Amino acid sequence: MAKPRDTWLYELKNHKRIVYIGISCDPDRRAIQHINAGKKFTHINVKSVALTAKSAERREKEEIQRYQRQHGGRPPKYNIAKTY
């Protein structure tokens, strides 16, 4: 049986700067949670089609690692817990 494709990769941006990379089954609801937690950003950008949870986790890790390589090892501003 095929695994459900119900997870999206997204990034939060403050103008042109990426401040968070994450995954969610409901990116709009997750954006509201980020706002309620005090995160500052101007928009959310969904970066993928619906993926399986495992594929989404792999893509999230790859995107955070790519960001770190391009920014001297630093993760996006709000990606404190998930750094690779």
Spans of features found by a protein language model:
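Internal alpha-helical transmembrane segments
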Residues: P75-P76
